[in-house]
Amino acid sequence: MGLVNSVPNRLKAVTLSVIVPYYNEAEVLPELHQRLTEVLSALPDSCEIIYVDDGSSDDSLQLVESFTAESCTIRSIGLSRNFGKEAAMSAGLEHSRGLAVILIDADLQDPPELIPQMLAKWREGYDVVNMQRTERQGETWFKRASAAAFYRLLNTLVKSDIPENVGDFRLLSREVVDHINQLPERNRYMKGIFVWPGFKQATLPFQRDARFCGETKWNYLKLIGLAVDGITSFSIKPLRLATLLGVLIAGSAFGYGAFIVFKTLLFGEVVTGYPSMMVVQLALGGIQLLSIGVLGEYIGRIFIESKGRPLYLVQSVSEKPATTQYQQLEKRA
């Protein structure tokens, strides 16, 4: 999996780990850190915040490494380059120590103030707490409509029931995290992976805020790529669909051919229709190319998996213990 550096620390276990993957978010990180620490300081639990830098080109990493907190440990993980959000989340999960683990985006669209409610559900015995967006402020109608259509398509194709309008903002128990960390796959669609282990799940509705500042790092091309990853990572039905299309077209062609032969022999009519034949040939050619493309997507993923490269590489790790916890440890020592 990833290249994990061994970092000596004096706090081997905590109740809650909050993972924040980010990429070029220097504008919003100070506000996020302030709101996170305010929420966590009000909790009676031991906490850690794990910031995962996905190869930022601005000063985000240096900014995070300067963060401190009185009530929770601050850990910073810097990846060697931009491996993508799925890899950054995986790095955070592998480095987490909490009995409960929460993933949250850095852009403050997911309110940190909901963390106590998520923990309350976890204490009721739920292993996964999904946060379902009832409203998506700051998003165009096209993005909302396309997201809804994608989730319907995905749940039609895959066996796992991936909740609609649930992003990466969720809570996972230690048991679920440990199972996810054992998965060897490199092409990761985390929304599906979070659901795949199963276990007892709860869903909390919330209103997703608009982005605090800056611009989203996800354009439509990246979203389409993520959608393709989601479908090909959890379903082989597109391959079966190509086979089904082939059978249907071959059957239709055979039936139409038999009809032409029967019509010519019985009525002596001359077969005409050059334009219609061209349309049929072009349609068949398009379907064949589409099927080859679908097959190529799966073969490409097999090729990537077969190389066995690490999902990510860690360039730097730093840690600042919580001031109050550190003082308590010193007194016990």
Task: Map each language-model feature to its residues.
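Hydrophobic helical membrane-anchoring modules
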Residues: 2-11, 189-333
